[in-house]
Amino acid sequence: CSYALLQQESAGKLLAVPTWQTIVLDEAQLIKNPATKRSQQAMALQGRFKIITTGTPVENHLGELWNLFRFINPGLLGSLESFNRRFAGPIERNQDREARQRLKRMIQPFILRRIKSQVLDELPPRTDIELQVELSEQEAVFYEALRRKLLNELNETQGPEENKRFKVLAAITKLRRACCNVQLVAPDLSLSSSKLALFGEVLHELLDNRHKTLVFSQFVDHLSLIRSYLDEKGIAYQYLDGQTPPAERKKRVDAFQAGQGDVFLISLKAGGVGLNLTAADYVIHMDPWWNPAVEDQASDRAHRIGQQRPVTVYRLVTKNTIEEQIVSLHRHKRDLADSVLEGGEISGKINAQELLSLIQKSS
């Protein structure tokens, strides 16, 4: 049963009637948010034995871990209010070691954690490389003007914390899009994209050496601009985003694996999991995402069982912009999961003021 089918009202009700002997949820991070229909339908399933598998048990905050345990072991971590008071709050806000250790002791008996290096000794090595993008003078002027304009608007924002946080995130998204290509923010401007130019240089070198490449972006319209570039250069490619029907999705994956196309353009959310694309030995992330675990899962479309060659992952990061600030958060995001699963330090959730500081520092 797919998650798309599960969250349909009629199918969800039908599946909730019997008591199943065993229920297994793969890619269980898809039910991390208790407010979603998908999560609510999953919680209604009755089973004597439940297993979940996920590469990202904590993507953003500990409330996600609470919801996963609500499925496999209801009541273990108490109500969400109790969990936030006893664990999430002290750990995320105050880096409380005692609370962290108590939570770890509670959940550890129910977790079997394996990292790739422990179970796949025969897998070729993976190399991660950050490529810095230098904005042109015109792009830098545009970015700084946009940054100042957004800061002025945010400084005038009134109202509750969550409302301000939403507006700050929207401003950050606009800056991130400007880092990719000015046309994504101001379509009427005819500024060339330094990031697209660097991408072209890297890609042509890879093609000259007979490599195949996966290209990920969070922005579908950014992928559209890259498609236009590939069309102009006569480069064969496959394409997949959230609007690609399942049957067509499989057809394009199979075609790429069979050698049809040297490049596969993929939206991060649509193709970051569940694909086997070992025909590629290079991965390019066009824009950094908040959570490095999501990028890692996308890179693992190439670096997985069946891969015979070393895999290289490039991340294109624009200098002196919001992208550098996001990359600096990656280490803290890794801490959030590792501190509970392995016992390291932890970072807290990001509030509106902390998000605003990312914009203030991104120049």
Task: Write out the residue ranges for each language-model feature.
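ASCE P-loop NTPase motor core, strongest for the SF2 helicase catalytic module
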Residues: 1-95, 104-363
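Long, charge-dense, solvent-exposed interaction surfaces that engage phosphate-rich ligands
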Residues: 100-102
